[in-house]
Design a protein with these regions (language model features):
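C-terminal helix-to-coil terminal segments
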Residues: 14-15, 86-97, 197, 204-262
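Phosphate/diphosphate ligand-binding glycine-rich loop within oxidoreductases
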Residues: 39-101
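Short, Asp-centered acidic motifs that coordinate Mg2+ and/or phosphate
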Residues: 38-40, 61, 143-144, 171, ...
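Rossmann-like adenosine-cofactor binding region
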Residues: 49-52, 132-211
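Redox-cofactor binding/interface segments in oxidoreductases and associated redox assembly factors
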Residues: 6, 41-43, 64, 146-147, ...
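N-terminal glycine-/charge-rich "phosphate-binding" loop or analogous flexible N-terminal tail
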Residues: 1-38, 126, 135-137, 260-262
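Glycine-rich adenosine-cofactor-binding loop
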Residues: 95-124
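Hydrophobic beta-strand scaffold residues
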Residues: 24, 83-85, 126-128, 219
């Protein structure tokens, strides 16, 4: 019996060799399979919330092939007793991509997840702000501002005029979702020379043109993921999925418990 569903197959070339007993679907493909059999669901882009959890009533684990959890409704998963674990892919590529975009001088890093922690090992002269810490504005002592935060209610529009207003000639580097940036404010900050350069690596394209028209913004689509040429680790994914089936998951984002239905 197949009890594994892997969605968003764009990063999955050759995964069948490592996980032969799985259903594998693209992001837009509808699952035509016995949904009650699925115990482990792995996603990269697809959202996991009420619809998914009700479609797969016996789901036990979600294995997220990304960073952060903004596409996973953790509250809903918790209510349904479904555990969540991340493969934390592309840490090396993302952290080195950020490092190579930094200018001389002190750096402030927003977010303290796996990519941020690896970046901290690669650089000196930095200060870290946990995403739970609310900062209204940054003092003019840093030359680089780095965003590694996930998108949630508290980080939406986080990088705005108020945050940067006391700074001058600053380099901003972000791998966060597009909605964490207030693009109109970023344009204003560039016009006032508070920001001298911006590097954003994300799939979002919201009002991207007005940023690019400043000629001071480099906007790429997840180039950092493959920055060092590392391929996706199918063996690691296979091992994590097996640990879910064995109910022996290390360092889950959310622990599994017996399903709690409404």
């Amino acid at each position: 019996m197949k009890n594994i569903l892997i969605k968003d197959k764009s990063d999955l070339d050759g995964v069948e060799e490592f996980i032969p007993n799985a259903y594998i679907l693209g992001a837009m493909e509808k699952p035509n399979l016995p949904s009650e059999d699925i115990k482990v669901l792995s996603t990269k882009f697809s959202k996991v919330g009420r619809t998914t959890l009700e479609r797969f009533p016996n789901l036990e684990w979600v294995v997220y092939r990304g960073h952060g959890t903004d596409s996973i409704n953790l509250d809903m998963c918790s209510q349904h007793g479904v555990g969540v674990v991340s493969t934390n892919p592309n840490i090396e590529g993302c952290s080195h991509w950020i490092k190579d975009k930094l200018k001389d001088g002190e750096t402030i890093i927003f977010g303290n997840g796996s990519i941020s922690k690896r970046l901290q090992q690669l650089i000196t002269d930095y200060h870290v702000v946990d995403s739970k810490t609310k900062i209204i504005h940054i003092d003019d002592e840093y030359k680089n501002v780095v965003s590694c935060v996930s998108l949630n209610q508290s980080t939406e529009d986080m990088f705005n005029y108020e945050l940067f207003k006391n700074m001058n000639d600053v380099n901003f580097v972000s791998i966060s979702r597009a909605k964490t940036h207030n693009n109109k404010d970023l344009v204003k900050l560039i016009e006032e020379n508070k920001l001298s350069s911006i590097f954003i690596d994300t799939l979002g394209t919201d009002v991207r043109d007005e940023l690019l028209n400043t000629n001071k913004v480099t906007y790429t689509k997840h180039m950092s993921w493959d920055y060092l040429g590392h391929k996706n680790d199918h063996k690691k994914l296979s091992e994590i999925i097996q640990s879910c089936l064995d109910d022996n998951v290390e360092n889950p984002i959310l622990s599994r418990r017996k399903n709690q239905w409404f």
